[in-house]
């Protein structure tokens, strides 16, 4: 699937980074919304009981979410999941698919398999002290949407076990 909007190049001089989100909806509804607007580069998760990966925007072009930061060299990945109200982590198959996608993003786009901060539970929107650290856009690696500066209303991707995902990626 390729979404026809946001076909603008990113700043290739910016540090390579990935941003993980949760859809807060299922596969079909999320894809339907993303085909109209706010498309990420990839969607990963369960589609009719099997894990799937869909690419909606080519890497190197601006994705539809995180508009204030889209000129950066970021790859946006939406995981099918609900992290706003519950302690969510991807199931094993989704975690493995995410790790495999991260390896491709590392090999093809240069995003290091790192997260810029130690593991912690920062709770819901606005409580993550890293939001104002100034690292996003200046440090390469993988970020959660909750790690990005402004607006202060994001919680995703929830309580992701970054170390576990990177361990899976290193075994790919």
Q: Where would I find each of the regions flagged by the language model?
A:
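Basic/polar, cationic surfaces and motifs that engage anionic cell-wall
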Residues: 1, 7-8, 84-172
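Short coil-to-beta-strand
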Residues: 68-79, 140
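N-terminal catalytic cores of peptidoglycan-degrading enzymes
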Residues: 1-71
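Short, histidine-centered active-site or binding-site loop motifs used for metal coordination
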Residues: 24, 79-83
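A cross-family glycoside hydrolase active-site/sugar-binding cleft signature
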Residues: 21, 78, 143-145
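Short C-terminal domain-edge/linker segments immediately following a structured domain
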Residues: 48-56, 75, 106-112
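Short, low-complexity, polar/charged sequence segments that are solvent-exposed and flexible
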Residues: 37-43, 73-76, 95-97, 161-165
């Amino acid at each position: 699937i390729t979404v026809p909007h946001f076909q603008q190049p990113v700043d290739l001089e910016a540090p390579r980074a990935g941003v993980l989100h949760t859809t807060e909806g299922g596969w079909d509804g999320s894809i339907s919304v993303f085909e109209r607007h706010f498309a990420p580069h990839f969607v990963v998760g369960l589609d009719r009981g099997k894990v799937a990966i869909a690419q909606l925007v080519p890497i190197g072009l601006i994705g539809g979410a995180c508009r204030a930061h889209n000129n950066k060299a970021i790859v946006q990945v939406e995981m099918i999941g609900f992290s706003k109200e519950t302690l969510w982590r991807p199931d094993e198959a989704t975690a493995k698919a995410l790790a495999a996608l991260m390896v491709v993003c590392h090999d093809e786009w240069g995003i290091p398999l790192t997260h810029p901060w130690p593991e912690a539970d920062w709770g819901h929107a606005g409580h993550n002290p890293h939001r104002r650290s100034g690292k996003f856009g200046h440090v390469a690696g993988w970020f959660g949407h909750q790690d990005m500066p402004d607006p202060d209303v994001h919680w995703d991707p929830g309580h992701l076990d970054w170390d576990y995902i990177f361990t899976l990626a290193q075994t790919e």
